[in-house]
Amino acid sequence: MPRLILASTSPWRRALLEKLTIPFECAAPDVDETPMPGEAPRQLVLRLAQAKAQSLAARFPNHLIIGSDQICVLDGEITGKPLTEEKARQQLAKASGNIVTFYTGLALYNSASGQLQTEVEPFDVHFRHLSEAEIDDYVRKEHPLHCAGSFKSEGLGIALFERLEGRDPNTLIGLPLIALCQMLRREGFNPLQQ
């Protein structure tokens, strides 16, 4: 049975995969994440998830390699990580009262057989109307500077929302576990029987 590799250094993805209680290792993929000109959000996350998984095939030739990538879209524009408090406040002000869609690309690559499975999971976050004071307090308390969309749903960010819509709440954090379990079973790797 091939071993599992998570092609990520994200502590959030690692924590999500640990929920399945199956053994795995993490490895950093070497992938240029620059969008191609005119590339749609779904195509971008699908391409990057696939590239991350396949980039580790030479190092891990008999493994199931999991690649994932996520972007945040508001009003048709990709919203990246804010990196500064001012940018985080701007992103949250723009999201206030609106719907932000997260697209998470998932790829499972069997480096022994060359079999590749991919999927894109959308997840909608409906923001409630936020006051400037609420936005300031949230940014000060959570420091969401390295989070797409400027929030952490697994923390205080939940207080920003009116409702969430999607098949798998893990998708919002960065790794759609329901889809991943389906892919693993198709490879003969049932997480319940490991």
From Swiss-Prot:
The gene is yceF1. This is 7-methyl-GTP pyrophosphatase. InterPro entries: ITPase-like_fam, Maf-like. GO terms for biological process: nucleotide metabolic process. Belongs to the Maf family. YceF subfamily. Transmembrane segments: none annotated. Nucleoside triphosphate pyrophosphatase that hydrolyzes 7-methyl-GTP (m(7)GTP). May have a dual role in cell division arrest and in preventing the incorporation of modified nucleotides into cellular nucleic acids. The keyword Cytoplasm applies. It catalyses: N(7)-methyl-GTP + H2O = N(7)-methyl-GMP + diphosphate + H(+). The lineage of its organism: Bacteria, Pseudomonadati, Pseudomonadota, Gammaproteobacteria, Enterobacterales. It comes from the Bacteria. The keyword Hydrolase applies. GO terms for cellular component: cytoplasm. Its cofactor is a divalent metal cation. GO terms for molecular function: nucleoside triphosphate diphosphatase activity. NCBIfam families: maf. HAMAP family: Maf (MF_00528). It is found in: Cytoplasm. It comes from Salmonella choleraesuis (strain SC-B67). The record marks 12, 70, 154 as: Important for substrate specificity. PANTHER family: 7-METHYL-GTP PYROPHOSPHATASE, BIFUNCTIONAL DTTP/UTP PYROPHOSPHATASE/METHYLTRANSFERASE PROTEIN-RELATED. Keywords: Cytoplasm, Hydrolase, Nucleotide metabolism. It holds the Pfam family Maf. Its main location: cytoplasm.
